[in-house]
Amino acid sequence: MITIENWGLISYSEAWERQTALFDELIDAKLNGKPYTNRIIFCQHPHVYTLGKHGKAANMLLNPKQLQAIHAELFQVDRGGDITYHGPGQWVCYPILNLEDFHLGLKEYLHLLEEAVIRVCQTYGIEADRVHGATGVWLATGTPGERKICAMGVRSSHFVTMHGLALNVNTDLRYFSYIHPCGFIDKGVTSLQAELRQEVPMDEVRDRLEQLILELLKETA
């Protein structure tokens, strides 16, 4: 059984603390044979940049004073990947799962999350795909117009996961211009709104993403 939680608009620091506590709790329960709950958490964050454990600080193009001027924060975090942006109009999804319940390794799990987002895009008539050597979901792959619509970065310990994905829905894409997103200098960023040229209902996107992740996990369990 998987519990779905919607944390609404929540500061990155509070969400990080809450998901870390749930992550540690699940690992402890798993290792000690106690009952536990698999969770998928949805939320949005105020303007924030997160830099993965192997990320390069040079991919943040603003100094602390400039960050303050655009009302954004910067956090170094314990996930894979480089730097990315989170903000209003973007769904962040944090699955806190015991992957062994779903017979998944980490690589297969990331592939599953990508597949769910690809299928969400398809429901809006948008063709999305993966890029070899890069995580996340992309549009116009293999062309000069290649652009990213969903970033991913996960931490795993004892096959328990935290962190997850960030899907741009009605995101203010200007905030990506202050970084080299995910460490890429020559690739663009997009959103459902930018592709469809109209605002997209946030709840509708979350419902579709939730349904597709659950369907794909059910197939593997």
Which residues does each predicted region cover?
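Short glycine/serine/proline-enriched coil/turn segments at secondary-structure junctions
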Residues: 84, 158-160
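Short conserved catalytic/interaction loops centered on acidic-Pro-aromatic/His motifs
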Residues: 126-131, 162-163, 175-179, 220-221
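C-terminal accessory segment of soluble enzyme catalytic cores
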Residues: 138, 155, 173-221
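Glycine-rich, charged/polar anion/phosphate-binding loops
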Residues: 149-156
